[in-house]
């Protein structure tokens, strides 16, 4: 069984960051070690919340505690997501180095959450710059959405070919695999939700139906997507297999959420279909 140190946000109510991804990842058969960068009452798109950002040293201290009991060598991957500060990011890269020293086979999966002001997702000053300058070259796998892909590649991305090219530009700087979590306006169809999975040799495209939630889109979809992809890849799935399973599993969560008329992702209700999706979407090699 694979062990994943997941360093991202936590909400007490609802699902975002680790609170969204942790259970689905476990449902696929991974051990998740959640380390929270923030603890908030709820996700920020409600417009108000309480809670705190963890001091950067807290992250390092927790991981040192795991090292002190001799367990860090059993960590197969570090996953990072929403950061409460750029300084937290620097500490996370130190943790990645520490984990890789204990287990040279360990991977670093970076979900470079950089904020969506129009969606109410706010990140601290310096976080975007941290991802561009430091996290990108340190990562083995990176999972930007379209906006984040443009920030990381430092140019606009207007179509699928542009996205593949931009992903390969990122690969030249460090990571082996790039997941473009949401192609949005750069995709083939505005009626579909599309993703890309790219390496130096391969590029896979997949699409699924959009699920209409009106003006209140559920939060945490990207967090679940990144976490599930990491689990599948660690378990030995091919790029195609991993992309197809993750796309179907996330769709099952979206359908359950819509059917139950909920705003928060219904990861518990959808748990059996996360492991064994009823829908199937075929990835195409470009």
Swiss-Prot record:
Pathway the protein takes part in: Cofactor metabolism; pyridoxal 5'-phosphate salvage; pyridoxal 5'-phosphate from pyridoxal: step 1/1
HAMAP family: PdxY
Catalytic class of the enzyme: transferase
Gene transcribed to yield this protein: pdxY
GO BP annotation list: pyridoxal 5'-phosphate salvage
SUPFAM superfamilies: Ribokinase-like
Family: Belongs to the pyridoxine kinase family. PdxY subfamily.
Record: residues binding ATP: 111, 143, 148, 181, 208-211
UniProt superkingdom: Bacteria
Single GO molecular function: magnesium ion binding
Gene Ontology cellular component annotations, sorted alphabetically: cytosol
Keyword flag Nucleotide-binding: yes
A Pfam family this chain is assigned to: Phos_pyr_kin
Necessary cofactors: Mg(2+)
Role this protein plays: Pyridoxal kinase involved in the salvage pathway of pyridoxal 5'-phosphate (PLP). Catalyzes the phosphorylation of pyridoxal to PLP.
Gene3D superfamilies assigned: 3.40.1190.20
Keyword field contains Transferase: yes
Catalytic activity: pyridoxal + ATP = pyridoxal 5'-phosphate + ADP + H(+)
UniProt keywords, alphabetically: ATP-binding, Kinase, Magnesium, Nucleotide-binding, Transferase
Species name: Salmonella typhimurium (strain LT2 / SGSC1412 / ATCC 700720)
Subunit structure: Homodimer.
EC number: 2.7.1.35
UniProt protein name: Pyridoxal kinase PdxY
Ligand binding (substrate): 9, 44-45, 223
Lineage, top ranks: Bacteria, Pseudomonadati, Pseudomonadota, Gammaproteobacteria, Enterobacterales
């Amino acid at each position: 069984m694979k062990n994943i140190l997941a360093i991202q946000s936590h909400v007490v109510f609802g699902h975002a960051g680790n609170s969204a991804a942790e259970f689905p990842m476990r449902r696929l058969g991974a051990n998740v070690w959640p380390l929270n960068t923030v603890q908030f009452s709820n996700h920020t798109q409600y417009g108000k919340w309480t809670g705190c950002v963890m001091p950067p040293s807290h992250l390092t201290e927790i991981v040192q505690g795991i090292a002190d009991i001799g367990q860090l060598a059993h960590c197969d991957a570090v996953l990072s997501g929403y950061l409460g500060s750029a300084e937290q990011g620097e500490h996370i890269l130190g943790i990645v180095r520490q984990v890789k020293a204990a287990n040279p086979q360990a991977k670093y999966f970076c979900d470079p959450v950089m904020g969506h002001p129009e969606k109410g997702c706010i990140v601290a000053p310096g976080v975007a710059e941290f991802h561009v300058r430091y996290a990108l070259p340190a990562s083995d796998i990176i999972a930007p959405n379209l906006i984040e892909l443009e920030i990381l590649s430092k140019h606009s991305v207007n179509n699928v070919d542009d996205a593949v090219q931009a992903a390969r530009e990122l690969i030249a700087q460090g990571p082996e695999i790039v997941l473009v979590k949401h192609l949005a306006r750069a995709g083939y169809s505005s009626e579909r939700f599309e993703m890309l999975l790219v390496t130096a040799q391969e590029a896979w495209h997949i699409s699924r139906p959009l699920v209409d939630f009106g003006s209140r889109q559920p939060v945490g979809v990207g967090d679940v997507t990144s976490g599930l992809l990491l689990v599948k890849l660690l378990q030995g799935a091919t790029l195609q297999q991993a992309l197809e399973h993750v796309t179907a599993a996330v769709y099952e969560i979206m359908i359950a959420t819509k059917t139950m008329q909920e705003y928060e992702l219904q990861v518990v209700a959808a748990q059996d279909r996360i492991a064994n999706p009823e829908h199937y979407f075929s990835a195409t090699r470009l």
